[in-house]
């Protein structure tokens, strides 16, 4: 029997010039690995190098080495991390595979060039450049025409294939498109971004199917899938008995937590949306309806392009079970399965180490970080005492909490 541990972690907040989160993040991951004690451990990373990747990508090999040192039980490491930010196909994705010596003789790695499995020899291999042509990895950035209206980003996927005790595993790291604007979900098509995520993941699944090489692998897709809540049902839940008020561009307001009260005399409201609504509206406010003049403009929720300010953000986090049903994007992928989610949203957590147990007021809470699998994999995992959870709740891991799935086969 082999104990497996799969982790996905968006590490975009980890890479800053001061590297202040490195030590706590490494300890948080190492503690989870120690508690599970797997023989085969894979961690998928997104946004390696962070937002300041030209400055901070040099930190990536350092943190890989430090994590490896913190996991002395593993004798073999295969690390594939795309930090070649000057390359056209740059994705900032990473896959780190740690294997115990006791499993070496029962593990082989697929060579996508020769289409053959090869035994593992060298104990440590770290590759950070030239992954497009590296034989043990498939890495692609999503085609530019997937989203022609915005700047071509670094979203894409990375695949490794392994044979472990005669079972074939495909581990796929995917980073799907995010929600560019909170307002677009109200002004335009509420499924605007989820439809593009579906297109991207369907593309990945089709590519994987074409490269199965005569087998049906146990497929695990785990990464920052950027799944978001159904905006209509979630907003209806939060804003019951409120009225929606678009706010003109020049209107500037602070946080609702600071006691925001909108003044009817100073507020310019567009009551008849038109063709130029996106251009003229900077925010949408949901205000309580009341017969009292003092409270009729009381703001429950204010939404801007990159702001989601609920009047009681702590309650929003504490009551996460009340909106679990609004997490529906997995329904778009009938061939993929997931263990039951019983953990809080994984995004957007505070990036401040002094205030790490709160959500930022940038986006609606969401379960962005997921582990999906095909039916064959799901059937085996179900019988293997699975545990599916997020972790790092007491420490700052950046704006995403890592998610893990452990099981035995």
Curated annotation (Swiss-Prot):
Molecular-function GO terms, alphabetical: inositol phosphate phosphatase activity; inositol-1,3,4,5-tetrakisphosphate 5-phosphatase activity; inositol-1,4,5-trisphosphate 5-phosphatase activity; inositol-polyphosphate 5-phosphatase activity
Keyword Translocase: no
SUPFAM superfamilies: DNase I-like (SSF56219)
Biological processes per GO annotation: negative regulation of epidermal growth factor receptor signaling pathway; ovulation; phosphatidylinositol dephosphorylation
Top-rank EC class of the record's enzyme: hydrolase
Superkingdom per UniProt: Eukaryota
Pfam families, sorted: Exo_endo_phos2
EC number: 3.1.3.56
InterPro entries xref list: Endo/exonu/phosph_ase_sf, INPP5A, IPPc
Catalysed conversion reaction: 1D-myo-inositol 1,4,5-trisphosphate + H2O = 1D-myo-inositol 1,4-bisphosphate + phosphate; 1D-myo-inositol 1,3,4,5-tetrakisphosphate + H2O = 1D-myo-inositol 1,3,4-trisphosphate + phosphate
Disulfide partners: none
Keyword vocabulary terms for this entry: Hydrolase
Family: Belongs to the inositol 1,4,5-trisphosphate 5-phosphatase type I family.
Protein name: Probable type I inositol 1,4,5-trisphosphate 5-phosphatase
Organism: Caenorhabditis elegans
Record gene name: ipp-5
């Amino acid at each position: 029997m082999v104990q497996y541990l799969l982790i996905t972690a968006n590490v975009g907040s980890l890479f800053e010039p001061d590297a202040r989160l490195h030590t706590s993040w490494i300890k948080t991951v190492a503690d989870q690995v120690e508690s599970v004690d797997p023989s085969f451990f894979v961690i998928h990373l997104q946004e390696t190098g962070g937002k300041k990747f030209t400055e901070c990508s040099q930190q990536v090999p350092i943190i890989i080495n430090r994590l490896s040192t913190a996991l002395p039980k593993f004798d073999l490491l295969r690390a594939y991390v795309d930090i070649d930010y000057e390359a056209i196909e740059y994705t900032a994705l990473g896959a780190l595979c740690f294997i115990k010596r006791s499993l070496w003789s029962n593990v082989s790695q697929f060579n996508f060039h020769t289409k053959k499995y090869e035994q593992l020899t060298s104990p440590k291999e770290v590759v950070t450049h030239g992954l497009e042509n590296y034989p043990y990895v498939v890495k692609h950035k999503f085609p530019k025409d997937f989203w022609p209206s915005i700047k071509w980003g670094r979203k894409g996927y990375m695949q490794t294939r392994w044979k472990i005790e005669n079972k074939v595993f495909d581990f796929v790291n995917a980073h799907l498109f995010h929600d560019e604007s909170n307002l677009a979900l109200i002004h335009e098509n509420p499924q605007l971004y989820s439809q593009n995520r579906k297109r991207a993941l369907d593309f990945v699944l089709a590519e994987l199917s074409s490269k199965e090489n005569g087998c049906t692998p146990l497929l695990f897709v785990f990464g920052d899938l950027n799944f978001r809540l159904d905006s209509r049902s979630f907003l209806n839940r939060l804003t019951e008995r409120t009225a929606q008020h678009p706010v003109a561009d020049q209107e500037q307001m602070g946080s609702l937590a600071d006691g925001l009260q909108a003044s009817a005399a100073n507020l310019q409201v567009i009551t008849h949306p038109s063709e130029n609504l996106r251009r003229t509206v900077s925010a949408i406010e949901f205000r309580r309806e009341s017969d009292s003049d003092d409270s009729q403009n009381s703001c429950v929720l204010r939404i801007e392009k990159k702001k989601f300010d609920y009047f009681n953000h702590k309650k929003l986090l504490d009551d996460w079970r009340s909106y679990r049903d609004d997490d529906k994007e997995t329904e778009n992928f009938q061939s993929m399965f997931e263990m039951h989610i019983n953990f809080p949203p994984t995004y957007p957590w505070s990036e401040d180490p002094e205030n790490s147990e709160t959500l930022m007021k940038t986006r609606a809470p969401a379960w962005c970080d997921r582990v999906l699998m095909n039916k064959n994999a799901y059937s085996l995992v179900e019988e293997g005492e699975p545990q599916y959870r997020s972790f790092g709740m007491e420490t700052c891991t950046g704006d995403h909490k890592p998610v893990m799935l452990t099981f035995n086969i």
